[in-house]
Amino acid sequence: MDANLLQWKNQGQSFLSRLRTWVCLLDPSLLLSSNAEILKAHSLIGSTEKLDGKDEAAVNLSLSSSHPGSGAVLPLFFRPPAYLPISGPLVVASLLPHSGVKAAMFWQFLLQSYNAGFSYVHRNSSTEKEKTTSLTQLLLMVGTVSYTTCAGALPQIFIDRLRIRSPPLQTLCRSVLPIPLSAALAFFNVLTVRHQETETGIQVFDCNGNPVGVSKAAGSKAVWETALSRAVLFGTTAVVPNLLVLFLQRFFQRNSLLMAPCRHISVALVFGLMIPVSFSLFSPAGTINRESVEEELQAGASGQTLFYHRGL
């Protein structure tokens, strides 16, 4: 078991402890560290020496910048601290009332492409023999991005193609429809990009960190939990600003110029606050009951709970 995953196993089994950890790990200043510093921090927490308070910075650097499954340094733009600075503006832009279909599809394409790349980088690759991306996986990602881009632009497509001019119907397309659509597309994005894990399975470990074998049940559970957490992130980000506008409707009727800035700021604020919450819903060191895995793995497992790298 990798040192990062072992760290999550020992300290991240409660929601509040994970939330406190993620608040520290999402610090953008961690992006300034070099690969050598990251590898040094990872080797430090993997040593047999007991860590003290002075090593907290090394723990945060390792958990935020190296892969919990392999220990490899994550690409700069796909590290958790970079998620808000990069995807935040894309989320705000994708939820804007667009003037045409092309603008809506452009921002959806950027957002869905980044989310697909983020999910792929943070996948569980324990059963992959080749380090290069396969043609099947590449085609799956291209198809996922294409489909979610078109589906994400559906509200604007309805408005333009059906020539919707009625204010209630425009409100339905621009304020109500994006809520379930954002959650569903975020769920679908993770589910399809990481579909291979459900077919080939992922490595599971016993309570002592020893490898037990490869489990498809654990792979399905890992992908499902990650997809659900991403749906919560984007669904909440879409619904809260709309509720805010609804509650302050009378205020915005008197101050119409303030509605757009308040909406954009609330989207960015809710998205930023929900990132550590969604990342904390399930531990990166996922658990599964021994009875839930394949029969051939149950005999060689010690303890009632098995662990695996869930991904992000």
Spell out what each predicted region is.
Residues 140-211:
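Eukaryotic endomembrane system proteins
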Residues 78-83, 103-108, 132-148, 169-182, ...:
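Transmembrane alpha-helices of multi-pass eukaryotic membrane proteins
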Residues 99-163:
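Long, hydrophobic, well-ordered secondary-structure blocks that form the structural core
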Residues 189-287:
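Long, repeat-rich segments with strong aromatic
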Residues 1-96, 101-104, 269, 273, ...:
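Intrinsically disordered, low-complexity N-proximal targeting/linker segments that flank membranes
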Residues 88-96, 153-164, 241-255:
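Juxtamembrane "helix exit" motif at the C-terminal ends of alpha-helical transmembrane segments
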Residues 125-134, 164-168, 204-219:
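Membrane-interface interhelical loops and short amphipathic "cap" helices
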